[in-house]
Amino acid sequence: MDFRVIRGSLFVLRPTCARHTSQVTSNRMEFTVAITGASGSIYAQRTLTHMAASGVVERINLIMSDAAVTVARVEMGVDLRSSDVKTVNEWIGLPSHSRLIQLHRLDNIAARPSSGSHPQQGMVVVPCSMGTLGAIASGAGTNLIHRAADVTLKESRRLVLVPRETPYNSIHLENMLRLSQAGAHIIPASPGFYHRPKNINELVDHLVFRILDHLGVPHSQATQWTGLKDRPGELITTTED
């Protein structure tokens, strides 16, 4: 405790604690998005698009596996192999000069997402291959995607995994159970149809909005089911035994 004499009077100066900068919260959000080689590149595209449109996400750390680049080329005709972020920006509808997306090489285990001391809100792997899911479940990662997911779990941040495989074998299911028990959110790429999608984007977006819900990212679409009574023109029938 410090003392100070001012004009003959003794004052006691109470100690103050400096606020640790890593604990300061902000309305601005940062996430890591990883894309792996499972089918469903459009899920990654629409997730990035809606995160960018949310108005609260200020940085997205993007990591892509080699297989993800190949699948995106086959499914969507886009070449993401270049390290130029302009291609990604165009793919998700951002201006070419946007700095929202920060690309990280798969082998760069010194990148921001590899450290728990770097503050961010969470991570999503979309789509998530069974190989990546298994590596995360085992804790024996070999690349930045695995490491970033491990960090997200150990720091008790939100980790969303979007597996896209069919059928699941017992190993896949056991890995998903293990990750769920560790705190991960498992959201299979299984879109619903009760919202009557008119095109593939509406079909995909229904699942993407659930991903954003679990990440805590606001969006403009209502995803809460309110019952058939709130849908005009619906006929509710019951069957009595």
Positions of predicted regions on the chain:
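Short, low-complexity, charge-dense intrinsically disordered segments
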Residues: 1-7, 11-22, 26
